[in-house]
């Protein structure tokens, strides 16, 4: 059996005396898309931040076989983790092209791929990122991640939140292409997107792991989906932007 690329065990986070995570277990396979699911407030974003060392944490976070608890965020990310945060993380004072160049990759076929996935970025190369729509900024954030040849894992935190349906579709295609090269940990509440992309899922509830298994099985199980995720019908609806 292939060992997971990312193996999280008993991850706990306490912030300001408040217990946010009570012991999360999470595996991300060495290929494909793993979805991290849960209702609002379940601890999904805090789990990602804990994995990246952005918040104080205890437990074990093994990445590529190495323990990363005790490392700084810079040390962790330098080991090959691409991060698309919920707030998109673009540099608003830089142009689109300058944001993409932060990936430190010389022009090569990867730029062609980004422009193929997001034609608007080529058209708006000289435009300041701060003047872009939220959807266009998300394209920049994902495009920058795709251009970083050092990434061995991509973590995307609710990448379709609040986006128009057309942009949701473009983001889905981009994540599919990314997953052909590196594993993806996808935090998402758009269950149609999860159904399309993810082979495996982990569900959090109240800061703990409540379920782990094949995504298709969970999303086809009406009762379990309703209990864990709060959906009252089969979770195979058409993807919509802002479906949160």
Label the predicted regions.
Residues 2-244:
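Glycine-rich phosphate-binding loops of nucleotide-dependent enzymes
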